[in-house]
């Protein structure tokens, strides 16, 4: 009877190991994306700060591909604020995803611990 339990534990450990490795990769990817979004947000904030120091009648050009489009100061300001808002929302989503992944790995580890405790009790 010990052999089936050992096979069951071995299978559970290999599944846990695969899940941990997969989760670690996903968490690293989420961290990289969060860092990139933080840089984007900071860049937009700094650009907006510089733009707001200029007088309202200043001509501003937005780079679009290989050309530049004349924009008002207010339009560029609104675009930069929207960019910051979108980055902040994506950061929150990634943080939630990251915490979910970490929680799921912890639950899997707890299940294996319970399995080991049940085996020792037998």
UniProtKB/Swiss-Prot annotation:
Keyword check for Acetylation:
yes
What GO biological process terms does the UniProt entry carry, in alphabetical order?
A: negative regulation of amyloid fibril formation
As stated in the Swiss-Prot or TrEMBL entry, residues carrying the post-translational modification N-acetylalanine are 2
Q: Which GO terms describe its cellular component?
A: cytoplasm; prefoldin complex
Which Pfam families does the UniProt entry name for this protein? Prefoldin_2
On whether Thylakoid is a keyword of this UniProt record, the answer is: no
Q: List the molecular function annotations (GO) for this entry.
A: amyloid-beta binding; protein folding chaperone; unfolded protein binding
Q: What keywords is this UniProt entry annotated with?
A: Acetylation, Chaperone
Q: Which InterPro entries match?
A: PFD_beta-like, Prefoldin
Which CDD domains does this chain map to?
Prefoldin_1
Cited function: Binds specifically to cytosolic chaperonin (c-CPN) and transfers target proteins to it. Binds to nascent polypeptide chain and promotes folding in an environment in which there are many competing pathways for nonnative proteins.
Complex and partners:
Heterohexamer of two PFD-alpha type and four PFD-beta type subunits.
Q: Which family does it belong to?
A: Belongs to the prefoldin subunit beta family.
What is the name of this protein?
A: Prefoldin subunit 1
Source organism of this protein record:
Pongo abelii (Sumatran orangutan)
